[in-house]
Regions:
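Hydrophobic beta-strand scaffold residues
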Residues: 35, 80-81, 109, 140, ...
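Short beta-strand-to-turn element immediately C-terminal to the catalytic PLP-Schiff-base lysine
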Residues: 115, 153-158, 191-194, 263-264, ...
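ATP-dependent carboxylate activation and anion-phosphoryl transfer catalytic cores
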Residues: 1, 233-315
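Short, flexible, mixed-charge acidic loops at enzyme active sites
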Residues: 68-75, 213-220, 276
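Active-site nucleotide/adenylate-binding loops and adjacent lid/helix of ATP-dependent enzymes
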Residues: 1-7, 50, 91-179, 183-184
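ATP-binding N-terminal substructure of ATP-dependent carboxylate-amine bond-forming enzymes
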Residues: 1-97, 116-128, 306-315
Length: 315
C-alpha cells in the first residue's frame, strides 16, 4: 500500500497540518506502510494522476483542506481518500450548515445565529447586537462559520463583550456564528470504521486551565488537561457516544471523523461541531482516543487506510 499524505497548505493552520502529516507518516512507517508527504501545490494533480497512489490521506486543515475543494478534485481523479466526500465535507466545514442538519435530524445543538459581515454592518451593529443579546441570552460563544483549531473563538458575557468577540471572529472570515454557551463537560468523540462498521472511540474530556479551549490550549503542552476516557458514568458516556455516532452518520463523515459535544449539568449531550480532518499531532484529540481504545497508532491508521480503500472500491 502506498499513501500520499496531503499536509501544509496556506491556511492559518498550516503548522498544525504539517505536524499532523509528519506524525501520521511516522506511525504508518511503524507498520510497514510507505507514505509520502505532499503539499497542495501546482504539481499535485499531475503527480497524483501519474503515480496513482492507493490512497490519499489529507490532514490539511482550514480552507482548501476541509471545505470540500480538495475532496472534489480527488473524486474527479478517481483516487481513494480518507474521510468525507466533497459535498459532506463542505457542509460540515460550514458550522451553520452542520448545525442546521443536526437540528433537522432531531439532535440537540445550542441555539445560534450566523451573521455575514456585510449584514452586521448594513443593519446597524448596535441594533443587531441588542437583538442577538436578547434572543440568545448570555453567555455566548462567537466563532467564524468556517474555520478550525479554535481560531477566532471567544466567549462573551455582555453586549460589549459580544461586539469585541464579533470583531475578533470576523478577522478570520466573512461570516460568524453566535451560539448560546452551555456550561458542562466538553468532549471530543472520534468515530472510525475499520471494516466492521462505524464505532465511537472513548470520549476525550477537555479541561482547559484557562476555561477556554482555544488555539494555545489545543497545541501548547500543559495548557489543557485531557482525560481519555472521559470521567463520565457509563450511561452518560453511552448517550454521548450514541449522539456522536448519529451526528457522524447525518453529516456523512466517512471512515474517520470527530464530533465535538458538551454534556450539560443535567447530563444531556449537545452537538457543537464536527471535523472532517481531525488533527494527529502529539496533543491532538483523536490519537488520545485511539490509545484509550487500546490501539497502537500505527495499527489504527493502517486499519482506517484499508477501510477507506475498501469503501472507495464499493462506490
Amino acid at each position: 500500500m502506498r499513501i500520499v499524505i496531503l499536509a501544509g497548505g496556506i491556511s492559518p493552520e498550516r503548522d498544525v497540518s504539517l505536524k499532523s502529516g509528519r506524525r501520521l507518516a511516522d506511525h504508518l512507517s511503524e507498520v510497514g506502510i510507505e507514505s509520502e508527504i505532499r503539499e497542495p501545490d501546482e504539481l499535485l494533480i499531475d503527480y497524483l494522476a501519474t503515480t496513482k497512489p492507493d490512497l490519499v490521506w489529507s490532514v490539511l486543515h482550514g480552507a482548501g483542506g476541509e471545505d470540500g475543494a480538495v475532496q472534489r478534485l480527488l473524486e474527479m481523479l478517481g483516487v481513494a481518500f480518507v474521510g468525507a466526500g466533497s459535498r459532506n465535507a463542505k457542509n460540515t466545514w460550514n458550522k451553520a450548515a452542520a448545525k442546521a442538519k443536526i437540528a433537522q435530524a432531531g439532535l440537540a445543538t445550542p441555539d445560534w445565529i450566523s451573521l455575514p459581515k456585510n449584514t452586521f454592518k448594513q443593519l446597524n451593529a448596535k441594533s443587531v447586537l441588542g437583538l442577538v443579546s436578547n434572543d440568545l441570552n448570555f453567555p455566548l460563544i462567537t466563532k467564524p462559520v468556517e474555520g478550525g483549531s479554535a481560531q477566532g473563538v471567544s466567549r462573551s458575557d455582555d453586549q460589549k463583550g459580544l461586539g469585541k468577540s464579533m470583531v475578533e471572529a470576523y478577522a478570520y472570515g466573512e461570516e460568524v456564528i453566535i451560539e448560546h454557551f452551555i456550561q458542562g463537560t466538553e468532549l471530543a468523540i472520534t468515530i472510525i470504521d475499520t471494516g466492521e462498521g462505524l464505532k465511537a472511540l472513548p470520549a476525550v474530556e477537555i479541561e482547559a486551565e484557562s476555561g477556554n479551549f482555544g488555539y494555545q490550549e489545543r497545541y501548547v503542552p500543559g495548557e489543557t488537561t485531557f482525560y481519555a476516557p472521559a470521567r463520565l458514568n457509563g450511561n452518560i458516556a453511552q448517550a454521548a457516544a450514541d449522539m456522536a455516532l448519529e451526528a457522524h452518520r447525518e453529516l456523512g463523515l466517512g471512515v474517520f471523523g470527530r464530533v465535538d459535544l458538551i454534556v450539560d449539568e443535567n447530563n444531556k449531550p449537545w452537538f457543537l461541531e464536527a471535523s472532517v480532518s481531525p488533527g494527529l499531532t502529539e496533543t491532538s484529540l483523536s490519537p488520545q482516543a485511539f490509545v484509550a481504545a487500546g490501539y497502537s497508532l500505527g495499527e489504527a491508521y493502517k486499519a482506517i487506510a484499508e477501510s477507506a480503500i475498501s469503501y472507495q472500491s464499493r462506490q
